[in-house]
């Protein structure tokens, strides 16, 4: 599933990618 990480990635990458989040549709999600 895709859980929103509460972070957008329109201008900058997901800082929460350190926690396993990735950018999808301008919003960071965790798979």
UniProtKB/Swiss-Prot annotation:
Provenance organism: Melicytus chathamicus
Q: Which InterPro entries match?
A: Cyclotide, Cyclotide_bracelet_CS, Cyclotide_sf
As recorded in UniProt, coiled-coil segments are: none
Judging by the UniProt lineage, the source's domain of life is Eukaryota
Q: What does this protein do?
A: Probably participates in a plant defense mechanism (Potential). Binds to and induces leakage in phospholipd membranes, particularly ones containing 1-palmitoyl-2-oleophosphatidylethanolamine (POPE).
* Keywords from the named record: Disulfide bond, Knottin, Plant defense
Q: Which GO terms describe its biological process?
A: defense response
Keyword Cytoplasm assigned: no
Q: What is this protein called?
A: Cyclotide mech-4
Its post-translational modification remark reads: This is a cyclic peptide.
- Domain remark from Swiss-Prot or TrEMBL: The presence of a 'disulfide through disulfide knot' structurally defines this protein as a knottin.
Question: One Pfam family name from the record?
Answer: Cyclotide
Family to which the UniProt record says this protein belongs: Belongs to the cyclotide family. Bracelet subfamily.
Cystine bridges: 5-21, 9-23, 14-28
Where does cross-link Cyclopeptide (Gly-Asp) occur?
Answer: 1-31
